[in-house]
Regions:
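Aromatic-Pro/Gly-enriched surface loop or interdomain linker
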Residues: 25
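Glycine-rich beta-alpha loop elements in corrinoid/cobalamin-binding modules
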Residues: 14, 18-22, 31-40, 61-191
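Conserved phosphate-interacting/catalytic interface
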Residues: 11
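N-terminal start-of-chain detector that recognizes signal peptides
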Residues: 2-3, 57-60, 119
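Nucleotide-activated donor-dependent transferases that construct or modify glycoconjugates
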Residues: 1-7, 88-92
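N-terminal beta-loop-helix "entrance" segment that forms/cooperates
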Residues: 38-54
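N-terminal [4Fe-4S]-dependent radical SAM core
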Residues: 3-7, 45-47, 56, 177, ...
Length: 191
C-alpha cells in the first residue's frame, strides 16, 4: 500500500525496489495507491496555492481524483488478492519530509477497520526504525516492524513464510529474521 495522503504524483522509489525484488523471487505482488482518492487525499497543491505558498499553475488539469470510497476499494482488493502480507512503507512523497512521520499512521488508518482475514501487517520506515515500541503501543494490529532498509528483510520474511506448512511454523520462521520487531503474548521482541 502506498498510504500517501498528499495527492501529488511523485512515485516513491520503495515501490519499485520492494516490488521488483519480490517479483524477481517469484512472489506475487499487488499494489494499492491511495494518492488520488477524493475522500482521502489532501490536494496539497491547491492548499499551498490558496495560501500563497505556491504560484498558481494548471497542475489540477492533469490530475483526476478517484471518487470511489477508498476503504471499499481497498477491502475489495484485499478480498480479491487474499494476501498473506500487507506491507506499507512510511516513506513519504512529500518533498519536505514531514510526511514520513504520518505515513505509517496513514497506512494503519486505511487498514485498522477492514476485514483482513489472515493477512499479516508489516510496515517499515523511519518510525518503525526509531520508535518501535511506541508504534506497537499505538497501532496494535501491526504484526511486524522492519527496522532500517527493508527490501531484503521483507524478502527474507516472505521466503521463510513460504517454506513452512502451518501458520505457527510460518510465524516462528519469521521471528528469526534479523531487523524486525514484533509483539508476542504482550512481550516486545527485537532481532
Amino acid at each position: 500500500i502506498n498510504p500517501n495522503k498528499w495527492g501529488r504524483g511523485i512515485t516513491h522509489i520503495w515501490i519499485a525496489s520492494h516490488s521488483g525484488i519480490l517479483k524477481r523471487n517469484n512472489h506475487k505482488v499487488e499494489f494499492f495507491d491511495s494518492s488520488f482518492y477524493q475522500d482521502w487525499s489532501v490536494n496539497e497543491i491547491k492548499f499551498q496555492t490558496d495560501n500563497k505558498m505556491y504560484k498558481k499553475t494548471n497542475y489540477d488539469d492533469f490530475i483526476k481524483f478517484n471518487r470511489n470510497n477508498i476503504f471499499k476499494d481497498l477491502q475489495n482488493k484485499i478480498n480479491k488478492f487474499k494476501p498473506d502480507f500487507i506491507f506499507w512503507s512510511a516513506i513519504s512523497s512529500h518533498i519536505h519530509g514531514e510526511g514520513e512521520y504520518v505515513n505509517i499512521q496513514n497506512g494503519y488508518d486505511l487498514l485498522k477497520n477492514l476485514e483482513l482475514k489472515n493477512s499479516l501487517l508489516i510496515t517499515a520506515g523511519l518510525q518503525a526504525t526509531s520508535a518501535t515500541q511506541i508504534i506497537f503501543g499505538k497501532m496494535s494490529k501491526i504484526d511486524y516492524l522492519i527496522r532500517g532498509e527493508s527490501e531484503l528483510v521483507l524478502l527474507e520474511i516472505l521466503n521463510n513464510f513460504d517454506r513452512e506448512k502451518n501458520i505457527e511454523d510460518k510465524k516462528k520462521s519469521i521471528e528469526k529474521v534479523k531487523g524486525i520487531s514484533f509483539m508476542k503474548k504482550n512481550n516486545f521482541f527485537q532481532n
